[in-house]
Amino acid sequence: MFAYGTALLGHLFISLLFLGSLSAQEKVKIAPSSPGLSAWPVHLAAKESFFAREGLDAEIIVMRTNVGIAALVTGSIDFTTAGGSAMRAAVNGAPLKMVLNTNKKADLWILSQKNIHQVEDLRGKMIGVGGNWGTQFYLVLEALKHYGADKDVQLVSTGDVANGYFSLRQGNMPAVALTPPYSILAKRQGYRDLVRTGDVVAVSPTTGLVTTKEKIEREPQRIRRVIRALMKAVDYARARKAKMVQFIMRQYKMEKEVADSVYDAIMETLNPTLLLTDQEIQVELNRIAEQTKTKITARTADVADFFTAQQVALEFGR
């Protein structure tokens, strides 16, 4: 009887400790701009409990890019993953900084209906693009410019890449710009793969982790824990392809063969260091100035702060 009572008390004590650890978790709201895999480290960190292990109760809220940036500025959320668009907002005075970069190149594919055979055939046609004149729009224009077709197309917002994919399937759009997994699915379904932006556009830090300057100053430890969780998620995905493929299969309800292709695609554009140099940031500032035809006075330190990420990288032996 005594042994049974002691065991019962032990189980009760462990349960109370577990409940206490749950209640101690700090709420954090992160807004990816798409349900797709452009921000896969965030989705993976949530599903595989990397945030929870850092004492964070992460709420992942998919928001259109412009909505997410506005919500971040007003304090409704803590982070957005729309790195490129947030950088554009920062050069216009928004108090935002990128603190982690996951993609040095945008994994954006322009896919078309089967009767369109090359980029030049897009002249005079509509192209569906996710977001609302954010980074994806400018990347599509830059890729089209490479083929001399940027002046004669009409870019139309599809809201997000999932909507773009369904618009292509339903025949509502001659062409759309898609990220994985939708780009891979569309290719396998026979839609024309016209161009991959990463093949013709230089470094473009489209996706990462962005927060406000105020949070960087006032909540450095919380930012550190979010960065730790994301770095762990990235390292997990790189070291365990089979596990990551299973995650993609579950998350997007796709066959293993397709998930394998999706994995390879996202690894090709992953920024392995998760950091950017001042030179790389300046390249993006120069691109923004050229695309918007404005003079930009913002410095690299005004739009990015990788100090904490560098510290965590050293901690992980990166």
Regions found by a protein language model. Name each.
Residues P32, T102-S112, Q189-E219, I223, ...:
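Periplasmic-binding protein-like
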Residues T135-K151, A229-S261, A301-A304, T308, ...:
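Ligand-binding clefts/hinges and TM-proximal coupling segments of bilobed small-molecule sensing domains
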Residues A7-G20:
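Bacterial N-terminal signal peptides
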Residues G84-S85, A162-Y252:
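Pocket-lining segment of extracytoplasmic ligand-binding domains
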Residues A24-Q170, P174-P180, D193-V203:
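Short, glycine-/small- and polar/acidic-enriched structural segments
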